[in-house]
UniProtKB/Swiss-Prot annotation:
Coiled coil: 76-96, 158-209, 481-516
InterPro entries for this protein: Fusion_F0_Paramyxovir
Glycosylation sites: 27, 70, 116, 120, 126, 500
Region (Fusion peptide): 137-157
Source organism per UniProt: Human respiratory syncytial virus B (strain B1)
Domain of life: Viruses
Residues carrying lipid (S-palmitoyl cysteine): 550
Protein name stated in the entry: Fusion glycoprotein F0
Signal peptide per UniProt: 1-25
Gene Ontology, cellular component aspect: host cell Golgi membrane; host cell plasma membrane; membrane; viral envelope; virion membrane
Length: 574
Protein backbone atom coordinates (compact mmCIF):
# COMPACT_ATOMS: atom_id res chain seq x y z
CA UNK A 1 0.00 0.00 0.00
CA UNK A 2 2.83 2.36 0.88
CA UNK A 3 4.49 1.61 -2.46
CA UNK A 4 1.24 2.39 -4.29
CA UNK A 5 0.94 5.72 -2.49
CA UNK A 6 4.50 6.63 -3.46
CA UNK A 7 3.80 5.77 -7.10
CA UNK A 8 0.60 7.82 -7.18
CA UNK A 9 2.42 10.75 -5.57
CA UNK A 10 5.14 10.51 -8.20
CA UNK A 11 2.55 10.47 -11.00
CA UNK A 12 0.72 13.52 -9.65
CA UNK A 13 4.01 15.33 -9.14
CA UNK A 14 5.02 14.59 -12.75
CA UNK A 15 1.68 15.86 -14.07
CA UNK A 16 1.98 19.02 -12.00
CA UNK A 17 5.51 19.65 -13.23
CA UNK A 18 4.46 19.12 -16.86
CA UNK A 19 1.55 21.53 -16.45
CA UNK A 20 3.84 24.11 -14.88
CA UNK A 21 6.42 23.49 -17.60
CA UNK A 22 3.95 24.14 -20.41
CA UNK A 23 2.55 27.25 -18.75
CA UNK A 24 5.85 28.92 -17.93
CA UNK A 25 7.57 28.03 -21.20
CA UNK A 26 5.16 30.34 -23.05
CA UNK A 27 7.01 33.33 -21.55
CA UNK A 28 10.26 32.39 -23.29
CA UNK A 29 11.43 34.65 -26.12
CA UNK A 30 14.26 34.10 -28.57
CA UNK A 31 16.18 36.58 -30.69
CA UNK A 32 18.35 35.51 -33.63
CA UNK A 33 21.09 37.89 -34.77
CA UNK A 34 21.99 37.31 -38.41
CA UNK A 35 25.08 39.53 -38.22
CA UNK A 36 26.82 37.27 -35.67
CA UNK A 37 25.06 33.92 -36.28
CA UNK A 38 23.88 33.74 -32.68
CA UNK A 39 20.62 33.50 -30.76
CA UNK A 40 19.61 34.53 -27.24
CA UNK A 41 16.86 32.70 -25.33
CA UNK A 42 15.27 34.81 -22.59
CA UNK A 43 12.50 34.42 -20.03
CA UNK A 44 14.35 32.18 -17.56
CA UNK A 45 14.91 32.78 -13.85
CA UNK A 46 17.83 31.88 -11.64
CA UNK A 47 18.42 29.35 -8.89
CA UNK A 48 22.13 29.69 -8.21
CA UNK A 49 23.87 27.56 -5.62
CA UNK A 50 25.98 29.77 -3.41
CA UNK A 51 26.55 27.50 -0.40
CA UNK A 52 26.05 24.09 1.20
CA UNK A 53 23.92 22.80 4.04
CA UNK A 54 25.19 19.70 5.86
CA UNK A 55 23.21 17.31 8.00
CA UNK A 56 23.99 13.99 9.65
CA UNK A 57 21.76 10.97 9.07
CA UNK A 58 22.00 8.04 11.48
CA UNK A 59 20.57 4.58 10.88
CA UNK A 60 20.44 2.54 14.06
CA UNK A 61 21.46 -1.10 13.65
CA UNK A 62 20.83 -4.33 15.52
CA UNK A 63 23.50 -6.61 16.87
CA UNK A 64 22.46 -9.88 15.23
CA UNK A 65 24.47 -12.82 16.50
CA UNK A 66 24.16 -16.45 15.48
CA UNK A 67 20.66 -17.40 14.41
CA UNK A 68 18.85 -20.70 14.56
CA UNK A 69 17.59 -20.66 10.99
CA UNK A 70 18.74 -24.10 9.84
CA UNK A 71 15.52 -25.51 8.44
CA UNK A 72 14.85 -26.52 4.85
CA UNK A 73 11.64 -24.58 4.47
CA UNK A 74 11.74 -21.97 1.70
CA UNK A 75 10.71 -19.15 4.00
CA UNK A 76 13.40 -20.13 6.50
CA UNK A 77 16.04 -20.12 3.77
CA UNK A 78 14.90 -16.70 2.59
CA UNK A 79 15.06 -15.27 6.10
CA UNK A 80 18.53 -16.74 6.65
CA UNK A 81 19.69 -15.37 3.31
CA UNK A 82 18.38 -11.90 4.15
CA UNK A 83 20.02 -11.99 7.59
CA UNK A 84 23.33 -12.92 5.96
CA UNK A 85 22.95 -9.97 3.56
CA UNK A 86 22.36 -7.69 6.52
CA UNK A 87 25.47 -8.87 8.38
CA UNK A 88 27.63 -8.73 5.24
CA UNK A 89 26.48 -5.18 4.53
CA UNK A 90 27.43 -4.10 8.06
CA UNK A 91 30.83 -5.79 7.70
CA UNK A 92 31.49 -4.09 4.34
CA UNK A 93 30.51 -0.71 5.73
CA UNK A 94 32.93 -1.21 8.62
CA UNK A 95 35.71 -1.98 6.14
CA UNK A 96 34.70 1.00 4.08
CA UNK A 97 34.74 3.28 7.10
CA UNK A 98 38.31 2.28 7.97
CA UNK A 99 39.53 3.55 4.60
CA UNK A 100 37.50 6.73 4.26
CA UNK A 101 39.35 10.05 4.30
CA UNK A 102 37.41 11.09 7.39
CA UNK A 103 38.96 8.20 9.33
CA UNK A 104 42.37 9.85 9.00
CA UNK A 105 42.51 12.96 11.15
CA UNK A 106 45.90 14.13 9.97
CA UNK A 107 45.92 17.32 7.96
CA UNK A 108 45.92 16.15 4.38
CA UNK A 109 44.12 17.30 1.30
CA UNK A 110 40.88 15.46 0.62
CA UNK A 111 41.54 14.53 -3.00
CA UNK A 112 44.76 12.51 -2.41
CA UNK A 113 43.08 10.80 0.56
CA UNK A 114 40.23 9.79 -1.68
CA UNK A 115 42.64 8.32 -4.19
CA UNK A 116 44.34 6.24 -1.49
CA UNK A 117 40.95 5.32 -0.16
CA UNK A 118 39.77 4.16 -3.59
CA UNK A 119 42.75 1.86 -4.05
CA UNK A 120 42.55 0.44 -0.51
CA UNK A 121 38.82 -0.10 -0.69
CA UNK A 122 39.01 -2.00 -3.95
CA UNK A 123 41.64 -4.26 -2.40
CA UNK A 124 39.79 -4.87 0.87
CA UNK A 125 36.46 -5.54 -0.76
CA UNK A 126 37.99 -7.56 -3.60
CA UNK A 127 36.22 -5.42 -6.12
CA UNK A 128 37.40 -5.97 -9.67
CA UNK A 129 37.66 -2.59 -11.34
CA UNK A 130 39.12 -2.12 -14.81
CA UNK A 131 41.77 0.52 -15.51
CA UNK A 132 39.26 2.62 -17.42
CA UNK A 133 36.86 2.56 -14.49
CA UNK A 134 39.64 3.47 -12.04
CA UNK A 135 40.52 6.51 -14.15
CA UNK A 136 36.87 7.56 -14.17
CA UNK A 137 36.75 6.97 -10.41
CA UNK A 138 39.73 9.17 -9.67
CA UNK A 139 38.55 11.86 -12.06
CA UNK A 140 35.23 11.97 -10.26
CA UNK A 141 36.92 12.27 -6.88
CA UNK A 142 39.21 15.06 -8.00
CA UNK A 143 36.25 16.88 -9.50
CA UNK A 144 34.16 16.82 -6.33
CA UNK A 145 37.07 17.45 -3.93
CA UNK A 146 36.35 21.13 -3.46
CA UNK A 147 32.57 20.72 -3.64
CA UNK A 148 32.40 18.37 -0.66
CA UNK A 149 34.91 20.17 1.56
CA UNK A 150 32.26 21.21 4.08
CA UNK A 151 30.80 17.70 4.20
CA UNK A 152 34.26 16.19 4.67
CA UNK A 153 34.92 18.53 7.59
CA UNK A 154 31.78 17.32 9.38
CA UNK A 155 32.52 13.71 8.47
CA UNK A 156 35.99 13.92 10.02
CA UNK A 157 34.66 15.24 13.31
CA UNK A 158 32.37 12.22 13.67
CA UNK A 159 35.46 10.02 14.00
CA UNK A 160 36.57 11.79 17.16
CA UNK A 161 36.00 10.00 20.44
CA UNK A 162 32.56 10.58 21.88
CA UNK A 163 31.01 12.31 18.88
CA UNK A 164 28.73 9.40 17.95
CA UNK A 165 27.58 8.99 21.56
CA UNK A 166 26.90 12.72 21.69
CA UNK A 167 24.59 12.34 18.69
CA UNK A 168 22.94 9.20 20.11
CA UNK A 169 22.23 10.92 23.41
CA UNK A 170 20.77 13.95 21.64
CA UNK A 171 18.43 11.66 19.71
CA UNK A 172 17.26 9.52 22.64
CA UNK A 173 13.86 11.14 22.94
CA UNK A 174 13.47 12.65 19.48
CA UNK A 175 14.11 11.84 15.85
CA UNK A 176 15.78 15.21 15.18
CA UNK A 177 18.23 17.32 17.13
CA UNK A 178 20.76 20.06 16.55
CA UNK A 179 24.13 18.86 17.86
CA UNK A 180 27.17 21.04 18.47
CA UNK A 181 30.24 19.11 17.33
CA UNK A 182 33.76 19.41 18.71
CA UNK A 183 34.84 21.76 15.94
CA UNK A 184 32.16 24.24 16.98
CA UNK A 185 29.87 23.53 14.05
CA UNK A 186 26.22 22.83 14.82
CA UNK A 187 24.50 20.33 12.55
CA UNK A 188 21.00 18.97 12.34
CA UNK A 189 21.01 15.24 13.01
CA UNK A 190 18.22 12.75 12.49
CA UNK A 191 17.80 9.05 13.09
CA UNK A 192 16.12 6.23 11.20
CA UNK A 193 14.71 3.50 13.45
CA UNK A 194 12.59 1.47 11.04
CA UNK A 195 15.10 -1.31 10.45
CA UNK A 196 16.26 -1.69 14.05
CA UNK A 197 12.74 -1.66 15.47
CA UNK A 198 11.57 -4.29 13.01
CA UNK A 199 14.53 -6.59 13.63
CA UNK A 200 14.48 -6.29 17.42
CA UNK A 201 10.73 -6.30 18.00
CA UNK A 202 9.39 -8.56 15.26
CA UNK A 203 12.05 -10.57 13.46
CA UNK A 204 14.43 -11.73 16.20
CA UNK A 205 11.68 -13.10 18.48
CA UNK A 206 10.52 -15.29 15.60
CA UNK A 207 14.05 -16.34 14.69
CA UNK A 208 15.36 -17.11 18.17
CA UNK A 209 12.26 -18.25 20.03
CA UNK A 210 10.40 -20.11 17.30
CA UNK A 211 13.44 -21.55 15.49
CA UNK A 212 12.59 -19.59 12.34
CA UNK A 213 9.19 -21.25 12.02
CA UNK A 214 7.50 -18.59 9.90
CA UNK A 215 3.83 -19.03 9.18
CA UNK A 216 3.54 -16.64 6.23
CA UNK A 217 5.68 -15.18 3.48
CA UNK A 218 4.71 -11.59 4.40
CA UNK A 219 7.27 -11.63 7.19
CA UNK A 220 10.02 -12.41 4.69
CA UNK A 221 8.83 -9.73 2.27
CA UNK A 222 8.59 -7.10 4.98
CA UNK A 223 12.12 -7.81 6.18
CA UNK A 224 13.42 -7.61 2.61
CA UNK A 225 11.76 -4.22 2.18
CA UNK A 226 13.15 -2.89 5.46
CA UNK A 227 16.59 -4.31 4.72
CA UNK A 228 16.77 -2.97 1.16
CA UNK A 229 17.69 0.53 2.33
CA UNK A 230 20.78 -0.63 4.21
CA UNK A 231 21.84 -2.90 1.34
CA UNK A 232 21.49 -0.10 -1.23
CA UNK A 233 23.36 2.38 0.95
CA UNK A 234 26.16 -0.15 1.29
CA UNK A 235 26.20 -0.75 -2.47
CA UNK A 236 26.26 2.96 -3.33
CA UNK A 237 29.06 3.79 -0.92
CA UNK A 238 31.10 0.76 -2.01
CA UNK A 239 30.76 1.45 -5.72
CA UNK A 240 31.23 5.22 -5.46
CA UNK A 241 34.21 5.36 -3.12
CA UNK A 242 32.27 6.66 -0.13
CA UNK A 243 30.88 9.72 -1.91
CA UNK A 244 27.68 9.54 -3.92
CA UNK A 245 25.84 11.98 -6.13
CA UNK A 246 23.04 12.40 -6.97
CA UNK A 247 21.36 11.83 -3.63
CA UNK A 248 19.26 8.68 -3.92
CA UNK A 249 15.97 7.97 -2.17
CA UNK A 250 17.80 5.29 -0.16
CA UNK A 251 20.18 7.84 1.32
CA UNK A 252 17.29 10.20 2.00
CA UNK A 253 13.65 9.42 1.31
CA UNK A 254 11.38 12.06 -0.20
CA UNK A 255 9.64 12.68 3.12
CA UNK A 256 13.01 12.98 4.89
CA UNK A 257 14.29 15.35 2.22
CA UNK A 258 11.22 17.60 2.42
CA UNK A 259 11.47 17.63 6.19
CA UNK A 260 15.15 18.53 6.02
CA UNK A 261 14.46 21.35 3.52
CA UNK A 262 11.81 22.71 5.87
CA UNK A 263 14.40 22.82 8.69
CA UNK A 264 17.05 24.62 6.64
CA UNK A 265 17.88 28.22 7.65
CA UNK A 266 16.65 29.75 4.39
CA UNK A 267 13.73 31.92 3.29
CA UNK A 268 10.28 30.56 2.55
CA UNK A 269 10.77 31.31 -1.14
CA UNK A 270 13.93 29.23 -1.16
CA UNK A 271 12.18 26.39 0.67
CA UNK A 272 9.31 26.52 -1.80
CA UNK A 273 11.75 26.46 -4.71
CA UNK A 274 13.62 23.42 -3.36
CA UNK A 275 10.47 21.54 -2.34
CA UNK A 276 8.97 21.91 -5.81
CA UNK A 277 12.19 20.81 -7.52
CA UNK A 278 13.35 17.87 -5.41
CA UNK A 279 14.81 15.99 -8.39
CA UNK A 280 17.10 18.89 -9.24
CA UNK A 281 18.04 19.21 -5.56
CA UNK A 282 18.96 15.52 -5.51
CA UNK A 283 21.13 15.90 -8.61
CA UNK A 284 23.17 18.65 -6.96
CA UNK A 285 23.47 16.97 -3.54
CA UNK A 286 26.03 14.58 -2.04
CA UNK A 287 26.14 11.87 0.59
CA UNK A 288 29.44 11.13 2.33
CA UNK A 289 30.25 7.94 4.23
CA UNK A 290 31.31 8.80 7.78
CA UNK A 291 31.34 6.09 10.46
CA UNK A 292 29.70 2.91 11.69
CA UNK A 293 30.07 2.67 15.45
CA UNK A 294 28.03 1.96 18.57
CA UNK A 295 25.45 0.16 16.43
CA UNK A 296 24.94 3.35 14.44
CA UNK A 297 25.63 4.03 10.77
CA UNK A 298 26.25 7.77 10.34
CA UNK A 299 26.76 9.61 7.07
CA UNK A 300 26.69 13.23 5.98
CA UNK A 301 24.12 14.61 3.56
CA UNK A 302 25.14 17.82 1.80
CA UNK A 303 22.36 19.87 0.18
CA UNK A 304 22.70 22.97 -2.02
CA UNK A 305 21.69 26.40 -0.79
CA UNK A 306 20.31 28.56 -3.59
CA UNK A 307 21.32 32.01 -2.43
CA UNK A 308 20.40 33.77 -5.68
CA UNK A 309 16.91 33.16 -7.02
CA UNK A 310 14.44 34.84 -9.38
CA UNK A 311 16.97 37.04 -11.23
CA UNK A 312 16.75 37.07 -15.06
CA UNK A 313 18.74 34.44 -16.95
CA UNK A 314 19.38 33.97 -20.65
CA UNK A 315 21.17 31.44 -22.81
CA UNK A 316 23.43 32.30 -25.73
CA UNK A 317 23.63 29.90 -28.69
CA UNK A 318 26.32 30.39 -31.35
CA UNK A 319 27.25 28.78 -34.65
CA UNK A 320 30.06 29.33 -37.23
CA UNK A 321 29.70 32.35 -39.52
CA UNK A 322 31.67 32.01 -42.77
CA UNK A 323 32.04 33.80 -46.09
CA UNK A 324 30.26 32.27 -49.08
CA UNK A 325 31.37 34.32 -52.08
CA UNK A 326 34.85 32.88 -52.43
CA UNK A 327 35.94 29.71 -54.17
CA UNK A 328 35.79 26.52 -52.16
CA UNK A 329 38.60 26.11 -49.65
CA UNK A 330 39.29 29.84 -49.37
CA UNK A 331 36.55 30.92 -46.98
CA UNK A 332 37.14 32.54 -43.62
CA UNK A 333 35.03 31.86 -40.52
CA UNK A 334 34.25 33.54 -37.22
CA UNK A 335 32.38 32.07 -34.23
CA UNK A 336 31.34 33.65 -30.97
CA UNK A 337 32.82 31.66 -28.09
CA UNK A 338 30.79 33.21 -25.28
CA UNK A 339 28.01 30.63 -25.53
CA UNK A 340 26.44 29.43 -22.28
CA UNK A 341 24.10 30.53 -19.51
CA UNK A 342 24.04 34.06 -18.08
CA UNK A 343 22.27 35.19 -14.91
CA UNK A 344 22.11 38.60 -13.27
CA UNK A 345 23.78 38.50 -9.87
CA UNK A 346 24.20 41.52 -7.57
CA UNK A 347 24.94 44.10 -10.26
CA UNK A 348 27.13 41.83 -12.35
CA UNK A 349 26.54 38.75 -14.46
CA UNK A 350 27.33 35.13 -13.56
CA UNK A 351 28.45 33.34 -16.72
CA UNK A 352 28.33 29.54 -16.99
CA UNK A 353 30.36 28.56 -20.09
CA UNK A 354 29.56 24.86 -19.67
CA UNK A 355 25.84 25.06 -20.22
CA UNK A 356 25.34 21.35 -19.53
CA UNK A 357 26.31 21.83 -15.88
CA UNK A 358 23.14 23.86 -15.38
CA UNK A 359 19.84 22.03 -14.98
CA UNK A 360 16.67 23.52 -16.43
CA UNK A 361 13.28 22.80 -14.94
CA UNK A 362 10.46 24.66 -16.64
CA UNK A 363 11.79 28.23 -16.89
CA UNK A 364 14.04 27.83 -13.84
CA UNK A 365 17.82 27.50 -14.31
CA UNK A 366 19.71 25.68 -11.53
CA UNK A 367 23.43 26.43 -11.71
CA UNK A 368 26.42 26.09 -9.39
CA UNK A 369 28.38 29.31 -8.88
CA UNK A 370 31.51 27.19 -8.49
CA UNK A 371 31.32 26.70 -12.28
CA UNK A 372 30.79 30.38 -13.08
CA UNK A 373 32.75 33.44 -14.10
CA UNK A 374 31.76 36.91 -12.92
CA UNK A 375 31.43 39.39 -15.80
CA UNK A 376 30.32 43.02 -16.02
CA UNK A 377 26.77 43.69 -17.13
CA UNK A 378 28.13 45.21 -20.37
CA UNK A 379 28.71 41.68 -21.65
CA UNK A 380 25.13 41.72 -22.96
CA UNK A 381 26.16 44.40 -25.48
CA UNK A 382 27.87 41.67 -27.51
CA UNK A 383 24.44 40.44 -28.59
CA UNK A 384 23.41 43.69 -30.25
CA UNK A 385 26.78 45.32 -31.05
CA UNK A 386 29.75 42.99 -31.17
CA UNK A 387 32.09 45.90 -31.98
CA UNK A 388 31.06 47.92 -28.91
CA UNK A 389 33.78 49.76 -27.00
CA UNK A 390 32.61 48.83 -23.47
CA UNK A 391 33.20 45.07 -23.57
CA UNK A 392 35.63 43.10 -25.72
CA UNK A 393 33.52 40.28 -27.17
CA UNK A 394 35.03 36.79 -27.40
CA UNK A 395 35.39 34.99 -30.73
CA UNK A 396 37.38 32.30 -32.51
CA UNK A 397 38.53 32.26 -36.13
CA UNK A 398 39.29 29.60 -38.71
CA UNK A 399 39.42 28.94 -42.42
CA UNK A 400 37.40 25.74 -42.27
CA UNK A 401 33.76 26.18 -43.21
CA UNK A 402 32.08 23.22 -41.51
CA UNK A 403 28.30 22.91 -41.77
CA UNK A 404 26.40 22.30 -38.53
CA UNK A 405 23.25 23.11 -36.59
CA UNK A 406 22.67 24.33 -33.04
CA UNK A 407 19.32 23.54 -31.42
CA UNK A 408 18.00 26.48 -29.42
CA UNK A 409 15.08 26.81 -27.03
CA UNK A 410 12.60 27.80 -29.74
CA UNK A 411 14.24 26.72 -32.99
CA UNK A 412 17.59 26.04 -34.62
CA UNK A 413 20.57 27.92 -36.05
CA UNK A 414 21.80 26.39 -39.30
CA UNK A 415 25.31 27.03 -40.66
CA UNK A 416 25.30 25.63 -44.18
CA UNK A 417 28.40 25.85 -46.40
CA UNK A 418 29.93 24.27 -49.47
CA UNK A 419 27.98 21.50 -51.12
CA UNK A 420 26.25 20.35 -47.92
CA UNK A 421 22.49 20.02 -48.18
CA UNK A 422 20.61 21.61 -45.28
CA UNK A 423 16.85 21.32 -44.80
CA UNK A 424 14.06 21.78 -42.26
CA UNK A 425 11.24 19.24 -42.20
CA UNK A 426 7.78 18.65 -40.81
CA UNK A 427 6.90 15.07 -39.87
CA UNK A 428 3.68 15.27 -41.89
CA UNK A 429 4.66 17.51 -44.82
CA UNK A 430 8.29 16.52 -45.33
CA UNK A 431 10.89 19.12 -46.32
CA UNK A 432 9.47 22.61 -45.91
CA UNK A 433 12.66 24.66 -46.24
CA UNK A 434 16.03 24.31 -47.94
CA UNK A 435 18.79 26.52 -46.61
CA UNK A 436 21.17 28.36 -48.91
CA UNK A 437 24.84 28.86 -48.08
CA UNK A 438 25.39 30.99 -45.02
CA UNK A 439 23.99 31.23 -41.49
CA UNK A 440 20.23 31.11 -41.03
CA UNK A 441 17.62 30.44 -38.35
CA UNK A 442 14.37 28.50 -38.30
CA UNK A 443 11.61 28.65 -35.70
CA UNK A 444 10.20 25.46 -34.20
CA UNK A 445 6.71 26.44 -35.36
CA UNK A 446 5.76 23.78 -37.88
CA UNK A 447 9.28 22.33 -37.85
CA UNK A 448 10.14 18.99 -36.26
CA UNK A 449 13.65 18.25 -37.53
CA UNK A 450 16.63 19.96 -39.13
CA UNK A 451 18.96 18.02 -41.40
CA UNK A 452 22.56 19.04 -42.15
CA UNK A 453 24.15 16.56 -44.50
CA UNK A 454 23.55 13.15 -42.95
CA UNK A 455 22.97 14.50 -39.43
CA UNK A 456 19.42 14.85 -38.13
CA UNK A 457 18.54 17.27 -35.32
CA UNK A 458 15.25 17.30 -33.39
CA UNK A 459 14.06 20.76 -32.40
CA UNK A 460 12.60 21.60 -28.99
CA UNK A 461 8.83 21.99 -28.87
CA UNK A 462 8.61 24.80 -26.34
CA UNK A 463 6.23 27.66 -26.97
CA UNK A 464 7.34 31.26 -27.14
CA UNK A 465 8.03 34.23 -29.35
CA UNK A 466 10.77 34.40 -31.99
CA UNK A 467 12.48 37.50 -33.37
CA UNK A 468 14.74 37.46 -36.45
CA UNK A 469 17.14 40.43 -36.34
CA UNK A 470 18.57 40.93 -39.82
CA UNK A 471 22.02 42.37 -40.40
CA UNK A 472 25.09 42.17 -42.61
CA UNK A 473 27.25 39.19 -41.54
CA UNK A 474 30.26 40.73 -39.83
CA UNK A 475 32.58 38.22 -41.51
CA UNK A 476 32.04 40.14 -44.75
CA UNK A 477 33.81 43.14 -43.22
CA UNK A 478 37.12 41.30 -43.12
CA UNK A 479 39.71 40.88 -45.89
CA UNK A 480 40.53 37.16 -46.35
CA UNK A 481 44.14 38.06 -47.21
CA UNK A 482 44.86 39.46 -43.74
CA UNK A 483 42.27 37.57 -41.65
CA UNK A 484 44.00 35.58 -38.85
CA UNK A 485 43.11 31.91 -38.76
CA UNK A 486 43.01 29.37 -35.91
CA UNK A 487 42.57 31.91 -33.12
CA UNK A 488 40.72 29.72 -30.63
CA UNK A 489 40.64 32.02 -27.61
CA UNK A 490 40.59 35.57 -28.89
CA UNK A 491 38.50 38.71 -28.85
CA UNK A 492 37.36 41.25 -31.40
CA UNK A 493 40.11 43.70 -30.44
CA UNK A 494 42.82 41.01 -30.61
CA UNK A 495 41.69 39.92 -34.07
CA UNK A 496 41.55 43.52 -35.26
CA UNK A 497 45.02 44.14 -33.81
CA UNK A 498 46.43 41.17 -35.72
CA UNK A 499 44.75 42.42 -38.88
CA UNK A 500 46.31 45.85 -38.34
CA UNK A 501 49.70 44.21 -37.79
CA UNK A 502 49.28 42.29 -41.05
CA UNK A 503 48.29 45.48 -42.87
CA UNK A 504 51.28 47.31 -41.39
CA UNK A 505 53.56 44.49 -42.50
CA UNK A 506 52.13 44.67 -46.01
CA UNK A 507 52.61 48.45 -46.11
CA UNK A 508 56.20 48.08 -44.91
CA UNK A 509 56.83 45.43 -47.55
CA UNK A 510 55.42 47.72 -50.22
CA UNK A 511 57.67 50.54 -49.05
CA UNK A 512 60.73 48.32 -49.15
CA UNK A 513 59.78 47.07 -52.58
CA UNK A 514 59.25 50.66 -53.72
CA UNK A 515 62.66 51.67 -52.37
CA UNK A 516 64.31 48.73 -54.11
CA UNK A 517 62.64 49.67 -57.39
CA UNK A 518 63.66 53.32 -56.93
CA UNK A 519 67.28 52.29 -56.36
CA UNK A 520 67.24 50.13 -59.45
CA UNK A 521 65.90 53.04 -61.52
CA UNK A 522 68.65 55.40 -60.29
CA UNK A 523 71.33 52.86 -61.11
CA UNK A 524 69.94 52.34 -64.57
CA UNK A 525 69.90 56.09 -65.20
CA UNK A 526 73.52 56.44 -64.08
CA UNK A 527 74.66 53.56 -66.23
CA UNK A 528 72.79 54.95 -69.20
CA UNK A 529 74.28 58.40 -68.63
CA UNK A 530 77.81 56.98 -68.43
CA UNK A 531 77.29 55.00 -71.61
CA UNK A 532 75.96 58.08 -73.37
CA UNK A 533 78.93 60.15 -72.16
CA UNK A 534 81.36 57.49 -73.33
CA UNK A 535 79.65 57.34 -76.69
CA UNK A 536 79.73 61.14 -77.00
CA UNK A 537 83.43 61.23 -76.11
CA UNK A 538 84.21 58.49 -78.61
CA UNK A 539 82.24 60.21 -81.30
CA UNK A 540 84.00 63.48 -80.50
CA UNK A 541 87.41 61.84 -80.78
CA UNK A 542 86.47 60.21 -84.03
CA UNK A 543 85.21 63.53 -85.39
CA UNK A 544 88.42 65.30 -84.39
CA UNK A 545 90.51 62.58 -85.98
CA UNK A 546 88.60 62.76 -89.21
CA UNK A 547 88.86 66.52 -89.24
CA UNK A 548 92.60 66.45 -88.81
CA UNK A 549 92.96 63.79 -91.44
CA UNK A 550 90.92 65.70 -93.94
CA UNK A 551 92.83 68.91 -93.23
CA UNK A 552 96.15 67.21 -93.69
CA UNK A 553 95.15 65.74 -97.02
CA UNK A 554 93.97 69.01 -98.57
CA UNK A 555 97.21 71.03 -97.77
CA UNK A 556 99.26 72.08 -101.22
CA UNK A 557 103.00 70.99 -101.78
CA UNK A 558 105.52 73.92 -101.52
CA UNK A 559 108.98 73.60 -103.37
CA UNK A 560 112.15 75.27 -102.18
CA UNK A 561 114.20 77.72 -104.25
CA UNK A 562 116.94 75.19 -104.91
CA UNK A 563 114.46 72.71 -106.19
CA UNK A 564 113.25 75.28 -108.70
CA UNK A 565 116.78 75.97 -110.08
CA UNK A 566 117.98 74.03 -113.00
CA UNK A 567 121.15 72.83 -111.41
CA UNK A 568 119.53 70.78 -108.83
CA UNK A 569 116.56 69.79 -110.85
CA UNK A 570 116.88 66.16 -111.64
CA UNK A 571 114.65 66.51 -114.57
CA UNK A 572 117.03 68.91 -116.23
CA UNK A 573 120.20 67.09 -115.26
CA UNK A 574 119.77 64.44 -117.79
Amino acid sequence: MELLIHRLSAIFLTLAINALYLTSSQNITEEFYQSTCSAVSRGYFSALRTGWYTSVITIELSNIKETKCNGTDTKVKLIKQELDKYKNAVTELQLLMQNTPAANNRARREAPQYMNYTINTTKNLNVSISKKRKRRFLGFLLGVGSAIASGIAVSKVLHLEGEVNKIKNALLSTNKAVVSLSNGVSVLTSKVLDLKNYINNQLLPIVNQQSCRISNIETVIEFQQKNSRLLEINREFSVNAGVTTPLSTYMLTNSELLSLINDMPITNDQKKLMSSNVQIVRQQSYSIMSIIKEEVLAYVVQLPIYGVIDTPCWKLHTSPLCTTNIKEGSNICLTRTDRGWYCDNAGSVSFFPQADTCKVQSNRVFCDTMNSLTLPSEVSLCNTDIFNSKYDCKIMTSKTDISSSVITSLGAIVSCYGKTKCTASNKNRGIIKTFSNGCDYVSNKGVDTVSVGNTLYYVNKLEGKNLYVKGEPIINYYDPLVFPSDEFDASISQVNEKINQSLAFIRRSDELLHNVNTGKSTTNIMITTIIIVIIVVLLSLIAIGLLLYCKAKNTPVTLSKDQLSGINNIAFSK
